[in-house]
Amino acid sequence: MQKDLTKGSALKNIITFSLPFLLANFLQTFYGMADLFIVGQYNGAASLSGVSIGSQVMHMITVMLVGIAMGSTVMIGRYVGERKEKEKRMTVGNTIIIFMILSLIVTLILLFFINPIVSIMSTPVEAIQETTLYLKICFIGIPFITAYNIISSIFRGLGDSKSPMYFVAVACFFNIVLDFIFIGYFNMHAVGAAFGTVISQLMSVIVALFAIIKRKLIVIHRYHLKLHKKIIKDIFKIGFPISMQDGLIQVSFIIITIIANSRGVDIAAAVGVVEKIISFLFLVPSSMLSAISAICAQCVGTKQHQRARQTLRYGCFIALGFGIFFALTCQFISKEILSLFTSEAIVIMYGSQYLKGYVLDCVFASIHFCFSGFFTAYGYSIISFIHNVISIVLIRVPGAYITSKLFPETLLPMGLTPALGSILSAMICVSIFIIMKKKNKFDY
């Protein structure tokens, strides 16, 4: 259902629009962890490692595709705000064609390079076969995974964040049920997890298409599917920098994981657990980024620039409030949180140190996440790409390496490096915002 996000209370809009985002992201994260949990219950280390490594590769591919799709979300949102029905439908049509072609190309390339990918990930010898089979099935299913994410991006551009939440709930339900059937009953190991993932995404797409047809949400004719240079350019101008940024962030996570792995199995385990915890805590700023992008895109379309800045301000306050709460809470109960995931005292000790430092990132990241969403709505997603690259190259990766060498007995300094990177990103974002505002770049 199309919704006008430029009317009513700006605060109420951002809360009601971001909440389904948050729930959808939570389900998506839970969905990813379900595979690991169920495989771990029924199979050995080789299968678990295969799914873990394979899902990491698939997550990188997915976030990069979703990053490009953000271009569609923003452009559709603008045309909704401008009341340009023809351009809106053409953007939807072009999005469908572009990503159909892109998903097929990506699938063929990944299948061709599957063995080098498994090798680059430093896959243990025992897990190579399981990882390869898992990735092969998931790569074949990329068109379905892409279709789900594209449909969700279109709905969000139309101002509907609830429907994508329902779609991911469908995928989550089928994934868990199929995992128990394929892995628990048929003992299919990592292959079962892969089939469960692909089939559940397909079921989600079928439900989404059924909803679109039944409710007549998007009426597309053949001429809307004709590729238009300007529309394609606009989508990639916004989406490509986000895609590259998200891909680079995932690469930095892999590098930091490699650094942690070099410090021994206990530290590697501690860092792995904390990364999972942080992924949950970051659902709030991540959801706020997406919500601000969609809402502000409609505001740009109606030239309600003051309302767009008001949305940014409310988003920052909400995300910052949650970030401060998480940061303070984890300083006092970090060991208790770690004990939910492991009973090994040494892992809890290292994990507690790492979490106390890392959780501060929730405070500062909440600022630059919100600004990134705002910049994206105005078509300046390149700013988000630049500040993230600077942060990763200058602080996050070298900081993790240097602190691992200077402080071998503790993980606290290594945990602080992401927060330091986010402080730099926040400073860059605020500075650029002030400069661009003075030049009336947000009032055209």
Regions found by a protein language model. Name each.
Residues M1-S18, I76-G141, Y185-F240, C296-D361, ...:
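Short alpha-helical transmembrane segments in multi-pass integral membrane proteins
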Residues L5-Y42, Q56-G71, M75, M100-T107, ...:
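N-terminal transmembrane alpha-helices
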Residues T16-D35, I137, A171, S200-S204, ...:
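Transmembrane helical elements of multi-pass membrane transporters/channels
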Residues L22, F26, F30, A34, ...:
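Generic alpha-helical transmembrane segments of integral inner-membrane proteins
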Residues F30-S49, V118-V125, I181-M188, G247-V274, ...:
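Helix-terminus/linker motif at the lipid-water interface of multi-pass membrane proteins
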Residues N43-Q56, L135, A194, V265-F280, ...:
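Small-residue hotspots at the loop-to-helix junctions and early N-terminal turns
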Residues L48-L108, I145-P164, A270-S334, A365-H387:
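Small-residue-rich hydrophobic transmembrane alpha-helices
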Residues A69, C138-R156, P164-C172, A193-I206, ...:
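Short runs within selected transmembrane alpha-helices of multi-pass transporters and secretion channels
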